[in-house]
Amino acid sequence: MQRSKIKVEIKRLSHGEDLSLPCYATTQSAGMDLYAALNDSAVLNPLERLLVPTGIVIAIPNGFEGQIRPRSGLAAKHGITVLNSPGTIDSDYRGEVKICLINLSNQPYEIKRGDRIAQILISPVSQVIWDDREEFCAEETGRNAGGFGSSGR
């Protein structure tokens, strides 16, 4: 099956000119890797968070969003993840893409310039029109209001 493709404008900022553009690691990858545009390496201590610049500005088309997600290897091997995962980049945002990382391990982790720190997915979005009602006539489901572990372990 052929994947749909959309064109997204991107600009490298001066502190990111030498870094790769976000790219897919494989032909079937859903997300593109984002790179740390740090001037110097930074140590992320346990339970510390850090806003890491990527050195890029993007113009996501209306009707789409950028989803910022952790890289699975960083999370599994080092406990480094995206704090507000998934982060959202709205189509009207025109500032630098920055990644809020947190170290959930008990060991310091060094982030170096050019490290792959997160992934971005460009995904379609819909906007909701609420149907505000006094009488709520939603059909019964097997779950109803059950949540927070109600479906078992």
Curated annotation (Swiss-Prot):
Q: Which one Pfam family would you cite for this protein?
A: dUTPase
The name on file for this protein is: Deoxyuridine 5'-triphosphate nucleotidohydrolase
Give the species.
Wolbachia pipientis wMel
- GO BP terms, alphabetized: dUMP biosynthetic process; dUTP catabolic process
On whether rRNA-binding is a keyword of this UniProt record, the answer is: no
UniProt key word Hydrolase = yes
Task: List the InterPro entries hit by this protein, alphabetically.
Answer: dUTPase, dUTPase-like, dUTPase-like_sf, dUTPase_trimeric
The protein's UniProt keywords, in alphabetical order, are: Hydrolase, Magnesium, Metal-binding, Nucleotide metabolism
Which NCBIfam families has this protein been placed in?
dut (TIGR00576), PRK00601.1 (NF001862)
